[in-house]
């Protein structure tokens, strides 16, 4: 791993020395390529404009070093460690190996009965055009979290823009953990606006969608609800410890009392989560996204998703689909 990191630093230094003062333009083009705003051909063309004819190989060496390091990190983090055979002798140490008598082989030779065959005859033909046509999709398109290699490549681009040499593995792990916690907070804020929940210790949310709400006009409703949701405070003389587990009979009794003291009308079924719910959750709970720049950018994206076509546009789209269907019918 250290060897690949040193190779990346050497390739970055050679590239910086070859480009000179225009290295910021190169980092900007690299960032645009990672965001898929420009193609690989356009990125190579811009890199050739910044480099001399003799230094074009430096650009290729730098890209190869980045891809190699990302691939090595993904393979080491995801693949379990396998036991490797050392290739040594199976004899016990300290005991000299006894010589075994070699008997002459009695296997008949059937080499003359077989014809030589090319082992590469059954290998499928690789088409480079198919690989070029397969575009790399972003996380917004695949609706999946970025892999460790993708996140490290993106962090390395940001590090190069800030005049940093490399990115540590601990920083990538910390970023992955922060991303998961951030998404968990957004989902918690979204679900808490739609479903009832309970609080433990005044801040921990749990039991989403239990649909057990206290009846405000019933005397035993609030004590039963708070006894099931709050934990007793720790004593000053005793250290704080985990709360004792409730026996099944007592838990069943508390649940029956809470259900008897709750409202008798069931909540109507909710519609699936939409962009309107996300907009309301972010507007009400601003603490989920404390950065103002990120909050403004995401609010703009959400408001842009709320656009819907008018009746005229729907009618024109229907006419266009009819023309396409008619043309396909005539062609076939």
Curated annotation (Swiss-Prot):
User: What's the gene?
Assistant: tada1
Q: Where is the composition biased (Basic residues)?
A: 95-104
Q: Name one GO molecular function term.
A: transcription coactivator activity
Sum up the protein's function in the record's words.
Probably involved in transcriptional regulation.
Task: Write out the similarity annotation.
Answer: Belongs to the TADA1 family.
User: Which terms does the UniProt entry file under GO BP?
Assistant: regulation of transcription by RNA polymerase II
This protein's name: Transcriptional adapter 1
**Which Pfam family name is an example for this entry?**
SAGA-Tad1
According to its UniProt record, where is this protein mainly located?
nucleus
Q: Which domain of life is it from?
A: Eukaryota
Outline the segment boundaries, as ranges, of region: Disordered: 79-106
């Amino acid at each position: 791993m250290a060897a690949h990191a040193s190779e990346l630093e050497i390739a970055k230094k050679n590239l910086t020395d070859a480009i000179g003062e225009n290295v910021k333009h190169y980092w900007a083009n690299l960032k645009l390529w990672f965001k898929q705003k420009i193609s690989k051909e356009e990125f190579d063309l811009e890199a050739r404009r910044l480099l001399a004819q003799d230094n074009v190989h430096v650009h290729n060496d730098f890209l190869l070093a980045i891809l190699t390091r990302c691939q090595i990190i993904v393979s080491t983090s995801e693949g379990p460690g396998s036991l490797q055979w050392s290739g040594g002798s199976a004899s016990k140490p300290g005991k000299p190996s006894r010589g075994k008598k070699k008997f002459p082989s009695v296997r008949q030779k059937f080499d003359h009965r077989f014809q030589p065959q090319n082992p590469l005859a059954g290998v499928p033909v690789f088409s480079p055009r198919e690989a070029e046509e397969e575009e790399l999709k972003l996380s917004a398109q695949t609706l999946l979290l970025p892999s460790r290699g993708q996140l490290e490549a993106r962090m390395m681009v940001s590090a190069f823009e800030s005049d940093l040499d490399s990115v540590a593995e601990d920083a990538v792990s910390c970023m992955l953990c922060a991303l998961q916690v951030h998404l968990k907070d957004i989902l918690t804020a979204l679900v808490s606006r739609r479903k009832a929940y309970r609080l433990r210790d005044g801040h921990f949310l749990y039991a989403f969608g239990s649909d057990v709400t206290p009846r405000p006009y019933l005397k035993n409703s609030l004590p039963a609800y708070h006894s099931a949701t709050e934990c007793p405070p720790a004593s000053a003389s005793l250290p704080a410890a985990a709360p004792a587990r409730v026996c099944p009979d007592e838990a069943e009794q508390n649940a029956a009392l809470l259900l008897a003291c709750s409202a008798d009308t069931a909540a109507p079924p909710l519609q699936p989560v939409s962009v309107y719910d996300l907009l309301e959750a972010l507007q009400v709970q601003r603490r989920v996204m404390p950065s103002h720049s990120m909050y403004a950018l995401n609010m703009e994206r959400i408001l842009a998703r709320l656009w819907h076509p008018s009746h005229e546009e729907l009618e024109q789209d229907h006419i266009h689909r009819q023309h396409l269907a008619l043309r396909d019918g005539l062609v076939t």
